Amino acid sequence: MPELPEVEVSRLGISPHIEGRTIKSVKVHDKRLRWPVPETVHKVEGHVLRSVSRRSKYLLLQTDNGCLILHLGMSGKLRVVPAETTHYKHDHIDIEFDNGQTLRLNDPRRFGALLYSESDVSGHELLSQLGPEPLTDAFNIDYLFERSRGRSQSVKTFLMDNKVVVGVGNIYANEALFKAGINPKRAAGKISKVRYQKLVPIIKETLASAIELGGTTLKDFTQVDGNPGYFAQKLQVYGRGGKLCMVCSNRLKEVRLGQRSTVYCTQCQR
C-alpha cells in the first residue's frame, strides 16, 4: 500500500504538469473503486486546477469550484500521459487537461478512490479527524509524549493511528522504531519522554529520506515517471523477519501487532 512518502512522491511528480491547467474532462472508466465515484466529480470540468496538495495519504486537487479527493488505495499509481495514450488494464480514471495531458489512475485492486468536496475540504469526513502531518512543527516531542500518556496499546499501533499522527504506515513505523531502539510491542504510555525525544526526529528523518529516494517499491508502486522507489534498498527490518540484524547479527523476530506484520530485533530494541 502506498504510504505517505509514496503519495508525496506522486504529488511532486504530477504537480508541474497539471497545476495551473484547465480541466477539460473527468472520465471514469470504472466506478467500482473503494467507494462508487460520484457524478459530482464532473463539477471541476472547465475550471483551473489551482493546486495539488496532500493531506495524509489523500491528494487534493483544488479548483475554484471544489476539490477532487484522490486516494491510491492498496495498489494505485498515477501517470501523466498524452490524452491519446493507449489504456492499460486497470486504468480506471482519466483527468484530461487543456494542454493535452491526462492524469491517469491505474488501480488493479480497486481500493483507490475519487471523491468531490464542494466546501472547505478540511472539513470533509475523511479529513476532519486526522492528526498532524509528521513533517510539520505540529508533530513534536511534547505533542507525541502527551498523546501517549495512559495508552496501553503497543507503541507501533499507536504511531499508526492516523488520529494521533498521519502517514506513519507499517513500513516506516517498523524502520523508525528500529532506529530509535524501541521494542514495537512496548506500551506507548510506558515509554519515557527521553525515548520520545529520540523517536520523533527519527520518524521525520525516515519519512524525509523515503521521499527523497522516491518512496518504497515492494510490488505495485512506481513513481509518476515509471521508476521504482529506491528506499526499499535502505530497509533494515521491514520484510526481513527471520534474517540477521544488520547491526548486531541477532535473528530478527516477526510478530503481528494490530493485524500488521512487525519485525524487530530483540537485542537492539528494548
Curated annotation (Swiss-Prot):
Cofactor note: Binds 1 zinc ion per subunit.
GO-annotated molecular function: 8-oxo-7,8-dihydroguanine DNA N-glycosylase activity; class I DNA-(apurinic or apyrimidinic site) endonuclease activity; damaged DNA binding; zinc ion binding
InterPro entries: DNA_glyclase/AP_lyase_DNA-bd, DNA_glyclase_Znf_dom_DNA_BS, Formamido-pyr_DNA_Glyclase, FPG_cat, MutM-like_N-ter, Ribosomal_uS13-like_H2TH, Znf_DNA_glyclase/AP_lyase, Znf_FPG/IleRS
Binding site for DNA: H90, R109, R151
Record: active site: P2 (schiff-base intermediate with dna), E3 (proton donor), K57 (proton donor), R260 (proton donor)
Record Pfam families: Fapy_DNA_glyco (PF01149), H2TH (PF06831), zf-FPG_IleRS (PF06827)
Zinc finger (FPG-type): 236-270
EC number of the protein: 3.2.2.23, 4.2.99.18
Cleavable signal peptide: none
Reactions listed under catalytic activity: Hydrolysis of DNA containing ring-opened 7-methylguanine residues, releasing 2,6-diamino-4-hydroxy-5-(N-methyl)formamidopyrimidine; 2'-deoxyribonucleotide-(2'-deoxyribose 5'-phosphate)-2'-deoxyribonucleotide-DNA = a 3'-end 2'-deoxyribonucleotide-(2,3-dehydro-2,3-deoxyribose 5'-phosphate)-DNA + a 5'-end 5'-phospho-2'-deoxyribonucleoside-DNA + H(+)
Cofactor: Zn(2+)
Annotated keywords: DNA damage, DNA repair, DNA-binding, Glycosidase, Hydrolase, Lyase, Metal-binding, Multifunctional enzyme, Zinc, Zinc-finger
GO BP, sorted A to Z: base-excision repair
Record's function text: Involved in base excision repair of DNA damaged by oxidation or by mutagenic agents. Acts as a DNA glycosylase that recognizes and removes damaged bases. Has a preference for oxidized purines, such as 7,8-dihydro-8-oxoguanine (8-oxoG). Has AP (apurinic/apyrimidinic) lyase activity and introduces nicks in the DNA strand. Cleaves the DNA backbone by beta-delta elimination to generate a single-strand break at the site of the removed base with both 3'- and 5'-phosphates.
Alphabetized HAMAP family for the sequence: Fapy_DNA_glycosyl
Family: Belongs to the FPG family.
Quaternary state and interactors: Monomer.
UniProt name for this protein: Formamidopyrimidine-DNA glycosylase
Name of the gene: mutM
